Amino acid sequence: MSAKNFKPFFLNSNLSFGKAGGDTVESLLRPAAGNSGNSYITYALVKTVLGDFAGLSHIANAYEYDFSASGRDAEFARAECTHVFLVLQDQIRIEESYGLRLPYENIASFLKKCGKPVVIAGLGANSFGGFDPEFHKKLPPALVKFLREISGMCEKIGIRGEFTADVLAKLGISNFQIIGCPSFFETGPGRRVEKPPFGELNPALTSPLIYRAESAPALMQDFLEKRLIDLAVFGRIPDGCPREEFYRAARGNLQIFLNPESWKAFLKKFNFALGPRVHGSIAAINAGLPAVCTNTDSRTAEMCAFLKIPRLADGPYADYKPPIPDAREFGAFLRRAYDACDVDAMNAAYPALFENYKNFITSQNLPFRCGECANAGMLSEVKVRGRIELFARRIAFKARRSAAKRLLKRNRS
């Protein structure tokens, strides 16, 4: 299909446009369904097939969308669009994150009303107990029905790795292609990452929870870091706020992004990344940094294995708990991560992986672009509180607390 005639509709884009929403962590992350990393998938797909964010036709959050009033959107997609992209992450799981449940029946009904070819790229299975050969038997029946139904609407489903392929095959679904994640390929075919000498490392963390020192720059993504997002973005200082948390925010070492371009621009200040966030690792790699992912779940394991993303998933500080206790332990952990970071293997595998992804797109008669994308500046920016404002709020907070204590003491006497 020519790019001129191509007009996609994105369902569950997880993108946020304009001013970042609201004054709570929940409202801020609502378009992204609770995790800013989700938006990276659609961002990459738009770069791949469209090349422009202006006028994007999309529904941001399928979990909160009112499908009872979806007639107008479905009719628009049917009349004006050529394809519907259903953006999913690791929803092949026994229970979803944050107590959510994808509205399977409503999504399937909406797609049928649209009457257009459906494209899915980046779907994964997630077993927190590792690669369970009986995992497919433990999935909710409604999810299994949904997977079979949407597979019939797609020419092929782009999936994350070998474990997902095994699960789908055991469910009787065969029209899939392993691609990893679209986000991994958003910078185009020529990407190479160089590893600096260990003595020159200037690392950033893909989650602040693994090491809590105020001097350690880190990226926040979801509700696991709610208290830190509340502090850094909204300036809310909780009772008993640890000193290192406050000073970490005041130094600008806690950041969150809804625009992947800004995310990568921040990461370019550093030359190494590590931590449990797989999309945090991918953002770092696309910013030119070697990165090591320390997550242990199957979602991460299969995608890192397929894409050759360096991974360190053993030892006491994998995942999020316990946090690394001190600078000495962090130094040792950093050394282990550095030694595990095989950028040569990743660089060598990338050209063939990129061609595989390109084949997935073009074999469905979709236009294929790569590289620059117009109007990415339309995506929302998140501004963290500055040092002066946070200190002013801290002084005011202490004054209010002191006044409340004096009043309580006076009332008791």
Summary of predicted features, one role per range:
Residues M1-S413:
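Active-site anion-handling motifs in enzyme catalytic cores
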